[in-house]
Amino acid sequence: MANYIHVPPGSPEVPKLDVTVQDQEEQRCRDGALSLLRHLRPHWDPREVTLQLFTDGITNKLIACYVGDTMEDVVLVRIYGNKTELLVDRDEEVKSFRVLQAHGCAPQLYCTFNNGLCYEFIQGEALDPQHVCNPAIFRLIARQLAKIHAIHAHNGWIPKSNLWLKMGKYFSLIPTGFADENINKRFLSEIPSPQLLQEEMTWMKELLSSLGSPVVLCHNDLLCKNIIYNEKQGDVQFIDYEYSGYNYLAYDIGNHFNEFAGVSDVDYSLYPDRELQGQWLRSYLEAYKEYKGFGSDVTEKEVETLFIQVNQFALASHFFWGLWALIQAKYSTIEFDFLGYAVVRFNQYFKMKPEVTALKMPE
């Protein structure tokens, strides 16, 4: 969903290192990481460097590099997943990272390398579904998302969403079948036909484009593990900007609400109810108006309008990640049931569709 992201003047340049980090064998992975650290932390003794693999990601591999026991200075090395260049524009990702960093919304980006990037580790706890429904935490999340959404486009330029372009690209990349007979049988029986998917995309674009949701700089992938909560400082930070770009404001929130259900063991009974959404959206609108300089008074009508936009755009989120998961099922080397995840997302799309399309905008 990238769309002419402009890096502010004066933003520090990001070095590109001619290093490839192999992630299939532990020793070769370590050798590659140490090659990066020779540039980024030349004072570290390579023999004392600890590498810790984080296992939550389902797009890339993430490794923490540090010396000693305290983890005060940690370099994160993110190795791009196999064929993820089909899904992610890596140049736009770096631009998003730099824009967010310039506005105090992202950690420091140390460098890029041939198959990944390195950045600053944020101290805190990566959240789980039980955290994001806690009012003390979800109000922080709402405010932080509002801060990102309020970032001005360059020179008053009015951005357009690339959601439909990106969705169309993903649709063109979905596999037509799988070599494994059992997987292929499941694919053909449980995934909607390409014709039906095409019809749904056309219908969705017509409905959602008419809702009047502003196009803003969005995170676009605000799952629980991409939110870092620092209890001591009382704040949250978002990480992983590879899907960031200009998109409908309501999509970003609807996508986050879908993520209340989790990723590895999805449970849509955890989708936030109307009361929780009302509190969340009010906190968001108050902060968004403050950041935009519109005061902070929020009416019931504004909350209700955003509620409807968000829940209808949640459909597009299910559809988008359903297509994404089908592509990952074909190419990813990460241990995860991507086909099963696609089934779950498309099933929830069709389950949710009649309920949310029945919602009517307030008079």
From Swiss-Prot:
Pfam families, per database record: Choline_kinase (PF01633)
Reaction catalyzed: ethanolamine + ATP = phosphoethanolamine + ADP + H(+)
One Gene Ontology biological process: phosphatidylethanolamine biosynthetic process
Compartment list: Cytoplasm
UniProt keyword annotations, A-Z: ATP-binding, Cytoplasm, Kinase, Lipid biosynthesis, Lipid metabolism, Nucleotide-binding, Phospholipid biosynthesis, Phospholipid metabolism, Transferase
Enzyme Commission numbers on file: 2.7.1.82
Single GO term (MF): ATP binding
Primary site of residence: cytoplasm
Pathway info: Phospholipid metabolism; phosphatidylethanolamine biosynthesis; phosphatidylethanolamine from ethanolamine: step 1/3
Gene Ontology cellular-component annotations: cytoplasm
Coiled-coil blocks: none
Functional note: Highly specific for ethanolamine phosphorylation. May be a rate-controlling step in phosphatidylethanolamine biosynthesis.
Similarity annotation: Belongs to the choline/ethanolamine kinase family.
Protein name: Ethanolamine kinase 1
